[in-house]
From Swiss-Prot:
Chain's role: Catalyzes the ATP-dependent transfer of a sulfur to tRNA to produce 4-thiouridine in position 8 of tRNAs, which functions as a near-UV photosensor. Also catalyzes the transfer of sulfur to the sulfur carrier protein ThiS, forming ThiS-thiocarboxylate. This is a step in the synthesis of thiazole, in the thiamine biosynthesis pathway. The sulfur is donated as persulfide by IscS.
Taxonomic classification: Bacteria, Bacillati, Bacillota, Bacilli, Bacillales
Protein name per UniProt: Probable tRNA sulfurtransferase
Pathway linked to the protein: Cofactor biosynthesis; thiamine diphosphate biosynthesis
Designated gene of the protein: thiI
Protein source organism: Bacillus thuringiensis (strain Al Hakam)
Catalysed reactions, as listed in the record: [ThiI sulfur-carrier protein]-S-sulfanyl-L-cysteine + a uridine in tRNA + 2 reduced [2Fe-2S]-[ferredoxin] + ATP + H(+) = [ThiI sulfur-carrier protein]-L-cysteine + a 4-thiouridine in tRNA + 2 oxidized [2Fe-2S]-[ferredoxin] + AMP + diphosphate; [ThiS sulfur-carrier protein]-C-terminal Gly-Gly-AMP + S-sulfanyl-L-cysteinyl-[cysteine desulfurase] + AH2 = [ThiS sulfur-carrier protein]-C-terminal-Gly-aminoethanethioate + L-cysteinyl-[cysteine desulfurase] + A + AMP + 2 H(+)
Pfam families linked to this entry: ThiI (PF02568), ThiI_fer (PF22025), THUMP (PF02926)
Length: 404
């Protein structure tokens, strides 16, 4: 019985790139190799406009499950490779069609003749291949406009690819082509989605989390570690910086008027994150802010908070409503972790009436009454840093180390 031997990957947005496309292709190939480490028999060949993954006996479903989370892949097809002879092509098309799952009633044939010396023209091949499928199936008809299955045949010199099963990739650009950012990872629903969408644009992320023991628990800290771990499904690794924030928050609560405590707290977070970004050679800061969602996410608040950093602040969720954000969180696997009922530092010392239109002048005046610099230095110096990788990759590395 014929089975899938290849997966053909299409790049999508990467095809719009010019002279630097080779960098994008190389990065994507590297990311795919990392993602498929578990499958030692696989061979990958990346060309200018497509990637070919030779399965060599590996389970195509298991491989496909990992490919769907790799940014930079627009679509991919499970494919069979047959000799470029009419009878072989007909048999391959039927075999591929019969492997399609689900309620299939209609199909069409699409032929692309890369090898122009093939003895039959496209219009001659269509009825030959389609007729063979009709003769060997029941209750199946041709529908060229809206078929359940499109049987794609690519004819080349010496061999042809037969494809039916087309699957969507994650889209976007390969992680690593767009530099690095620091993402503020609070533990809520929004910030992991912001990290995901940032990675989708080809940007590597490192996460910064502020925790305030004993006001925040170890379980709240573990929740953030689990979120960062979940995000590794979409990249090679996530470096997480856990910043002790208790003394900063206690001082803000004592020295700053309550209406401005939230604004000043966010400004301190930005200052600390900028310091870490400088250490880690990051180029921007990403947050999970959505315009108007809470008091610290009004335009006035963002204007005042942005003052303390020279780094670009990326806000992927800025125009989304909560339901849109939740939908993405559910799709990427972070929602159930985010809703664990453990408080983060943003809920500590929450003012009754936070300013929704804070002014820079007032924030600067309040901060000038106390020197926060030593507290910022201490928070940066005492941060805990951990590197998280996909669980399967870590297990493979530990298994390898046990051999020595």
């Amino acid at each position: 019985m014929m089975t899938y031997e290849y997966i053909l990957v299409r790049y999508g947005e990467m095809t719009t790139k010019g002279k630097n496309r080779s960098k994008f292709v190389s990065t994507l190939k590297d990311n795919v190799k990392f993602k498929l480490k578990k499958f030692p028999n696989i061979k990958i060949d990346a060309t200018h406009d497509r990637m070919y993954i030779q399965l060599n006996g590996e389970d195509h479903e298991a491989v496909s499950e990992r490919l769907k989370d790799v940014f930079g892949i627009h679509k991919f097809n499970l494919a069979m490779k047959v000799p470029s002879e009419l009878e072989d092509i007909k048999k391959g098309a039927l075999a591929a069609f019969l492997q399609v799952k689900g309620d299939v009633k209609t199909f069409k044939i699409t032929v692309h003749r890369s090898y122009k010396h093939f003895p039959m023209r496209t219009m001659e091949l269509l009825p030959e291949i389609g007729g063979h499928i009709l003769e060997n199936t029941e209750d199946i008809t041709v529908d060229v406009h809206n078929p359940d299955v499109n049987v794609r045949v690519e004819i080349r010199s010496g061999y042809s690819y037969i494809m039916c099963d087309e699957r969507m990739g994650a889209g976007g650009l390969p992680v690593g082509v767009g530099g690095k950012v620091m993402v503020l990872l609070s533990g809520g629903i929004d910030s992991p989605v912001a990290a995901y969408l940032t990675m989708k644009r080809g940007v590597s992320v490192e996460a910064v989390h502020f925790h305030s023991p004993p006001f925040t628990s170890e379980r709240a800290k573990q929740k953030v570690i689990d979120l960062a771990q979940e995000l590794t499904k979409y990249c090679k690794r996530v470096t997480l910086h856990l910043v002790p924030f208790t003394e900063v928050q206690k001082t803000i609560n004592k020295e700053i008027p309550s209406s401005y405590s939230m604004t000043v707290m966010r400004r301190m977070m930005m200052r600390i994150t900028e310091r870490i970004a400088e250490e880690r050679n990051a180029l921007a800061i990403t947050t999970g802010e959505s315009l108007g969602q809470v008091a610290s996410q009004t335009l006035d608040s963002m204007h005042t908070i942005n003052e303390v950093t020279n780094y670009p602040v990326i806000r992927p969720l800025i125009t989304m409503d909560k339901l849109e954000i939740i939908k993405i969180a559910e799709e990427i696997g972070t929602y159930d972790i985010s809703i664990r009922p453990y408080e983060d530092c943003c809920t500590v010392f929450t003012p009754a009436s936070p300013a929704t239109k804070p002014k820079r002048e007032k924030a600067n005046r309040f901060e000038a009454k106390y020197d926060f610099t030593p507290l910022i230095d201490e928070a940066v110096a005492n941060k805990e840093t951990m590197v998280l990788q996909t669980v399967e990759v870590v297990a493979e590395e530990e298994k390898f180390e046990e051999l020595f």
